[in-house]
Every structure is written in C-alpha cells, then in structure tokens.
Design a protein with these regions (language model features):
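Membrane-embedded alpha-helical segments of integral membrane proteins
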Residues: 11-69, 75-76
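Membrane-interface segments at or immediately adjacent to transmembrane helices
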Residues: 96-177, 183
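Short aromatic-glycine-enriched beta-strand elements
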Residues: 194-205, 248-251
Length: 270
C-alpha cells in the first residue's frame, strides 16, 4: 500500500452527491413541489434530511482535503455511483407531474364500498379526518353527523374532508340517498362503465405517492362522453343507490358539471 497526502477524489465525488441531494430537497421544500411526492405532514422530515445531508457534505468534503489517503489501487465499484446518479437524472429529465388518470387506471379502483383507508372508524387517520370534518361543519354553522357530514343542505366534499365524507357515504349509501352533493375531481373510466358513466376521483396520499390510491364515486350524466379521462370537473348532483359488481354503491346523478383547473395540490390526505 502506498500512503501519501493528496486530494481524495472518491470522497469528493461522494460529497458532491450529498450536496446535490441536499440542494434537491431544499428546492422541493422551498418551491412547494415536495407535496407532489409526500404527505405535507412529513415535510419537516424532508427539511431535516436536507440539513443532515448538507452537514454530511461539509464533513466529507473537509476530510477529502485534509487527510492522508491510502491507495490500494482498487477503484470503487461504479455501480455505487449509478445508484445515486439515477434518481438525480430522473428528476432533471422527467416532468414534475401529478399522478393522473392513466396511473389510476393501472392501479385500479374499487367503487364497491367505503375503502379509502385501512384504519377502523374512530382511530388513527380516520379519527383525525373525522375531527377535522366536524370542526369544518361547526365553523360553517352546520350540524354534522358522527362522520362529519353535514345533516342539512348540500354535502360539500372538499380537500380537507374528502376521505371522511367519501368513506362515510361509501359505507352507508342508503343513509345519504337523495342528498345533494358538490365535489371536485377528475374523470376516470374502466371497461365496466356504461357510456353515460364515469368515475369522479382524487388520489389519496397516506405517506407518499407510492401508496397513492384513487377514491371517489361513480357519476352518471347524459353528457359523460364530453369529458375525457383526466379532465378536472366541478359537479353538483344527487346521491342515488345502485348495484355495481354485485354490491350496493352510491352513484351521483349529475345535475351540473363544469370544467375546472387542476388544484395546485391535486391530492387529498387522511
């Protein structure tokens, strides 16, 4: 082995990788684009990770310039660098786009019942969503049932109460039959839909986009063919009960539809 005072290029390369990942995380957090990848409640963890990576870069870079380097004439395996370079290259080369109808079609969707979360009612994510929905109803001067759905007037499905309201209606559609509902979502279809039917959904993010699941309702409209998959629309309609795939499900009979812009944050969270 040969030992001499020199710049350790291997450590410099590693330190630059750490710097790039740190800059990437800082950029995503500052620009708000981090919400395209993870649940906002985990943003603080991304901030801490960016700071940690920046600190690791400083230590690694300092050590590369101020230490003896031992040469054993064995170059580091290039695959190690490829593993780090690929994510950076993908971020730079691929468009930063939200999950769309094609992803929803590939992942599939079960319209049969309220199935948006795996947590039992009254616990975990559903408990937080229920409390939030109830607070929203009370602040608006509306009485709500134990699911947070308003007892009178149109049911307004918002980004804040989406999971709880859609779950509640999906689990007990008969209880909400005849109620008017207003909702924003995007269009999706599958091979089982009739020409006048489509799904109106949004992606639900629990932790990150890897676990994203589409949730929403079947909607009926004589103008259904006018709206292509992926089109964002605002709708107003009446909840009906129908059979789908041998199960009772809520179906919205649309009375009003208008095209809408995709929200700045297209996802909803439990």
């Amino acid at each position: 082995l040969q030992q001499q005072m020199a710049i350790d290029w291997e450590k410099i390369i590693k330190s630059l990788m750490l710097l790039c990942f740190s800059i990437l995380l800082f950029y995503l957090v500052i620009s708000g684009q981090i919400q395209m990848y993870i649940n906002p409640r985990f943003t603080v963890l991304s901030e801490l990770a960016a700071v940690a990576l920046l600190s690791m870069f400083a230590v690694q870079f300092f050590n590369s310039r101020n230490s003896f380097h031992v040469y054993d004439h064995h170059a580091p395996h290039k695959l190690v660098y490829v593993i780090f370079i690929i994510p950076l290259a993908l971020f730079l080369l691929l468009p930063n786009a939200a999950l769309d109808a094609s992803v929803a079609s590939n992942r599939g969707f079960n319209f049969n019942s309220g199935n948006l979360t795996s947590a039992p009612p009254g616990s975990g994510a559903l408990a937080r969503a229920s409390a939030k929905s109830a607070d929203l109803g009370e602040s608006a001067g509306q009485q709500t049932d134990n699911t947070g759905v308003s007892k009178s007037g149109p049911i307004q499905v918002t980004a804040d109460n989406f999971v709880r309201v859609v779950d509640a209606i999906g689990q007990s559609p008969e209880d909400y039959a005849g109620r008017e509902i207003e909702m924003l979502g995007f269009v999706i279809r599958n091979k089982d839909f009739a020409p006048q039917e489509f799904g109106l959904i949004r992606f639900i993010i629990t932790c990150c986009t890897a676990d994203a699941s589409p949730g929403g309702f079947i909607l009926k409209s004589k103008d259904a063919v006018d709206y292509k998959d992926g089109t964002w629309i605002n709708i107003r309609g009446v909840i009906e009960v129908d059979d789908y795939d041998q199960q009772v499900v809520p179906v919205i009979e649309a009375t009003f539809i208008e095209r809408a812009a995709q929200p700045s944050d297209p996802y909803v969270y439990p």
